Design a protein with these regions (language model features):
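A compositional/biophysical signature of low hydrophobicity enriched in polar/charged and small residues
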Residues: 1-116
Length: 116
């Protein structure tokens, strides 16, 4: 496969009505068999979750979630995320503004690196 994974249109989430963006730290129950795989499978099915990253540190995963409003996020939290059996703790931080949001990789100078 080449360098291009896929071609997409970048949509304006606010114009489409998704005014709330939340970054969610999730800690899973320790020692639960298959907890990571089950969590990942369920999160992949949630359309509200734009990104899911496994972390090293205090929490296990970081999710980027969008909803139309705060009530929509509350419903997502209560009816989807919090009922996953392996979820032990959730910490939510609502974004007030996006200072930089890009999908561009820093390609300038990529081949000019000196490994010597």
């Amino acid at each position: 496969m080449g360098y291009v994974e896929r071609r997409v249109a970048v949509l304006d989430r606010r114009r489409l009505g998704f005014r709330v963006m939340v970054f969610v730290h999730v800690k899973l129950v320790r020692g639960a068999r298959n907890s990571v795989a089950e969590f990942e499978e369920q999160v992949r099915a949630f359309p509200e979750v734009l990104e899911c990253h496994m972390l090293m540190g205090e929490t296990d995963f970081l999710l980027k979630v969008v909803t139309q409003d705060v009530e929509g996020y509350e419903q997502f939290l209560r009816n989807k995320l919090s009922i996953i059996p392996s979820v032990q703790e959730v910490q939510s931080s609502m974004a007030l503004a996006s200072v930089k949001c890009t999908t561009e990789l820093p390609l300038a100078g990529l081949g000019a690196r000196d490994d010597g």
